[in-house]
Amino acid sequence: VGALQAGLPNASWKGADLLVNWVRFIKSDAEIAMMRQAGQIAEVAMQTAWDGARIGVRQCDLMADITASMIKGTPEFGGDMPALHPLILAGEAATAAHPMWNDSPLEAGQTVAFELGGCRKRYNVGLARTVHFGDPSDTLMRTSDAVQEGMAAVMDALHPGAVAGDVHQAWQKVLDRYGLEKKSRIGYSIGNAYAPDWGEHTLSLRPAERTIVPQNAVVHVILGMWMDDWGMELSETLHATGTGCVRLCNFP
């Protein structure tokens, strides 16, 4: 850069960090169509996780099946490897975000979160769900209730023209009522990406964020609650359109 500036002494220079990212922030109709296909692949991956999650199954064996399903995709179209590697958060490994899987078997009494995704021609869609082996504790059920209610509040607040910080506040009000705390952000713009990250580094759903949600933005809302010795996650990838938002995945 210094050599370029020295060679053009009469030019004026302005910072353009993330310029292309902000252009990518608003998706075309063709991109939305591609992300809908990625959403269908994410559904396939999560169904594979759901069907294969059994006590005694090794995490690595389950992840092998999940990864294969991501690449096989659907009968109509195949998938790519998502920009964020798929995650199994089991037991104490679920106390923090983004752990790698291992060769430990899934155990009775564990809470296991799956943070997966679908990718179609490098367009990524995230999807997270949580299962529990056995009878869930009152704390887990209460946290689950808060997270599900919080997701509904976020979806009600997320629409073209909304302020990102206001969307986060809708979540925070629910969390406050339950007496729970989450210090990290709850969502970000997602789209075309390569490893190691599928986020676009533009919009973030966090306090005081003043970015306006535009028409045809796509946001991965990830509600991860990581406790002292367990954790859970629920996520949806949402398309901001019209007067609200719609899910790009259809999974219970």
List PLM regions with ranges.
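Active-site neighborhoods and metal-handling regions in enzymes and metal-associated proteins
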Residues: 1-252
